């Protein structure tokens, strides 16, 4: 082969390589562009969903306070009530389920899907109430309110499945934030006395880089809180307006439509005193469901906790917030219908189990990761 042919072959190979590299770069640019577009669309979708849930939650909250027909009543056939239509064909022919007026006081029945009471009741309360209503009717002969207990557990599982991804993401993000608390404390200490704009920007940049490095989304833990508000209102309204629940007494002791604190003060010597035991069961379990995830997180991240403890003022604020939440939850359980307390009891048990399972999974992953690292070091002759 002559030198001219060799030169031509070399030039062709260079052109081919440059074309291949250009095509590869173009493909990578396209992929990166698609990824950016997908991330933007995902963020917009999340904002719309969370704004919707927050809006519907606030709407339901204000509606419950403002509209006269949302009045609660423990009296059968009174207040806002949801049940079956009174009809030989459509109805259940059972006074516990068919909507029949008591004859006194205001009464606002809801037997069919309708927007007459607003979108909150039509789109959220109605579907959940129908599941519980039909399940309780199918198991209406069960004794001691066992059908109501199992029905509430089914509702809890449905809601947990729907919100599983959000709650799991919030838990993982909280875990990641706990793991980098020590490094965050170091950044805060580094710029403790810095007041100029440049130093503040550097602090923000370092914190942002730390979050990106560990894939931390600081606002992710608050996502579950946005979903929690409408869910609480939905369950609250289902328990307080569902007609058959007004006939249920758990183990023939606790009336699900009654308010524990009212029963204790109004009928202590007769039916009120058992509600003390109701609160002594529900409230401690609810508090444990708040404390156990924190204790497990501390156990997983002892180093982060030790470093973070240097900032005693911040630690005090966190503990104070936790105590306030625990007190608020206890008060809400005491002043709400017993059905709410029962639902929260099962929810608390589920939260404790979920926290323990997540703890075991994380510890196993860390153990496996440490084993792999030790194996690689051993292969390199480092031990």
UniProtKB/Swiss-Prot annotation:
Chief place of localization: membrane
Pfam family, one: 60KD_IMP
GO CC annotation terms, alphabetical: plasma membrane
Transmembrane segments: 40-60, 118-138, 148-168, 222-242, 245-265, 268-288, 324-344, 345-365
Region forming the signal peptide: none
InterPro entries attached to this UniProt entry: YidC/ALB3/OXA1/COX18 (IPR001708), YidC/Oxa/ALB_C (IPR028055), YidC_ALB_C (IPR047196)
Any one Gene Ontology BP term: protein insertion into membrane
Subcellular location(s) of the protein: Cell membrane
Record has Hydrolase as a keyword: no
GO MF, any single term: membrane insertase activity
KW Protein transport (keyword) present: yes
Entry keyword set: Cell membrane, Chaperone, Membrane, Protein transport, Transmembrane, Transmembrane helix, Transport
Membrane topology: Multi-pass membrane protein
Assembly mode: Interacts with the Sec translocase complex via SecD. Specifically interacts with transmembrane segments of nascent integral membrane proteins during membrane integration.
Family that this chain belongs to: Belongs to the OXA1/ALB3/YidC family. Type 1 subfamily.
Protein's job: Required for the insertion and/or proper folding and/or complex formation of integral membrane proteins into the membrane. Involved in integration of membrane proteins that insert both dependently and independently of the Sec translocase complex, as well as at least some lipoproteins. Aids folding of multispanning membrane proteins.
Protein known as: Membrane protein insertase YidC
Species: Ureaplasma parvum serovar 3 (strain ATCC 700970)
Lineage: Bacteria, Bacillati, Mycoplasmatota, Mycoplasmoidales, Mycoplasmoidaceae
Gene that produces this protein: yidC
